[in-house]
Amino acid sequence: MARPTPAPISPDELVALAMAVMKAAKFPVLATIDGDQPRARPVSPVRTDGFVVYVANLRMYHKTAEIAANARVELCYLDDKHDQVRITGVAAVLTDRAILQSIWDGNPLLRQYLGTIENPALIVYRIEPVRVRYMKEWALEYHEVPMVARVGGAALPANGS
């Protein structure tokens, strides 16, 4: 049986398709490395800016030490149509107070569970993409998603800035 050839997709359409998958798939899987063992778990992003994804965490969770030892991570989004987006990136502890405050203000669950933004258990990771790939259903081939989106003919960074 011949392998199907995926139809070409324009760069602008790839960005839109990838964003749609991210919006539909509420709980991507975050992959980290624990020594020589990969670890994966579903996460609930607290904010996305284009392909930059913010994930809240508690210091006591295993991924804290894993990311401290190796900040290279991957997020995999899978929607109900089996379309996928994979974001390969680098996780860093968020230090921008304005963004942290915005995340805190917009997330009642964080406020309920942690009580205060100053709670030392709270860490928010900013995952900066270095590569974004999209796959339509089970096409068996990923498309590279451009890191720069075009809106109305003007180039904009894929992080929405």
Q: Residue ranges of each PLM-predicted region?
A:
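General beta-strand recognition
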Residues: V29, V52-Y54, E74, R86, ...
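Conserved beta-strand in the GNAT
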Residues: R41-S44
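Acidic-histidine catalytic/liganding microenvironments
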Residues: A25, N70, N107
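Phosphate-coordination/substrate-recognition cap region in phosphate-metabolizing enzymes
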Residues: Q37
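A short mixed-secondary-structure module that forms the rim of ligand-binding clefts
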Residues: V46-H82
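Charged, gly/pro-rich active-site loop segments
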Residues: M1-S10, Q84-S161
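A short, Trp-centered hydrophobic/proline-enriched beta-strand micro-motif
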Residues: A20-D34, V73-Y77
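Short, basic/aromatic recognition patches
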Residues: P4-F27
